[in-house]
Amino acid sequence: MPDNTREGSSARFVDGAIPAGLLAAVRSQRPLVHHITNGVTINDCANITICAGAAPVMAEAPEEVAGMVAAAGALVLNIGTLSAAQVEAMLIAGRRANELGIPVVLDPVGVGATEFRTATARKLLDTLDIAVLKGNAGEIGVLAGTGGSVRGVDSGGVAGDPVETARECARSTGTVVSMTGAVDVVTDGSRVFLVGNGNPAMDRLSGTGCMASSVTAAFVAVAEDYAVASAAALAAFGLAGEWGAAGARGPYTFRTALFDELAGLSPDDLAGHARIEER
């Protein structure tokens, strides 16, 4: 067997069969992913969920979310375009998901930009059992309390080491943290996974962060280890971005290619090209 441990380092690369097996499970089980998400990217999130191999539902009326989430394999809460009614729906659905053991993925879009947004993210974290907190570096830095810069919904980065910021956030919130960036960082506060798949074109298209949360939810719906599943999801999404960017002429040809590449991604493709390093 080849040695996949870097010389002089405790880091090792995760066997590609692991993310490949999770992608195969998503495709075979086709879990329902319930989204309470933002109005800007809702259609893209629904379609990327289908491309990953899962099934989306976008119900957010407080009167029906408890019933809808009961049929789901995972729940996504995305605070991109907040309202009081939507927050109520998130709390109702989140509590019901917790009762049923359904994993909840929280995307704290733009946390730190306004008091309402920040208070909502903290309320969801304090009230619900969040399985995965998926955000960019600025958002995770804000929630970690270590310093993060957010302008609108865009990240300005973190003040310190990204890995330690993500680790601190995971420890303080009790969640798996999935922090996207040039290199994605996934940690449960102890283990750290660095995901090297992706392309800068993904940063130039609105909604890729939200879509990453949808793909993450599809993977955690079929997994017991949410950190590994989150890393596998980002590797799959990032690989689709790499391959989609290769022939794209601009943001909208890239957008189409991103969907097409994820839909066409096979477990063997992911096994051979996922770049996930464990520390």
Swiss-Prot record:
Q: Catalyzes what? A: 5-(2-hydroxyethyl)-4-methylthiazole + ATP = 4-methyl-5-(2-phosphooxyethyl)-thiazole + ADP + H(+)
GO terms of molecular function: ATP binding; hydroxyethylthiazole kinase activity; magnesium ion binding
Whether Membrane counts among this entry's keywords is no
Q: Member of which family?
A: Belongs to the Thz kinase family.
Q: Which HAMAP family match?
A: Thz_kinase
Q: Which Gene3D superfamilies match?
A: 3.40.1190.20
Swiss-Prot/TrEMBL keywords: ATP-binding, Kinase, Magnesium, Metal-binding, Nucleotide-binding, Thiamine biosynthesis, Transferase
Give the protein's cofactors.
Answer: Mg(2+)
**Keyword Iron attributed:** no
Q: What does this protein do?
A: Catalyzes the phosphorylation of the hydroxyl group of 4-methyl-5-beta-hydroxyethylthiazole (THZ).
Query: Which positions in this protein are listed as binding ATP?
Result: 134, 180
Q: Quote the pathway field.
A: Cofactor biosynthesis; thiamine diphosphate biosynthesis; 4-methyl-5-(2-phosphoethyl)-thiazole from 5-(2-hydroxyethyl)-4-methylthiazole: step 1/1
> What domain of life is recorded for the organism?
Archaea
Q: Which GO terms describe its biological process?
A: thiamine biosynthetic process; thiamine diphosphate biosynthetic process
Name of the featured protein: Hydroxyethylthiazole kinase
Q: Please name the taxonomic classification of the source.
A: Archaea, Methanobacteriati, Methanobacteriota, Stenosarchaea group, Methanomicrobia
Q: Where does substrate bind?
A: 58, 207
**EC numbers:** 2.7.1.50
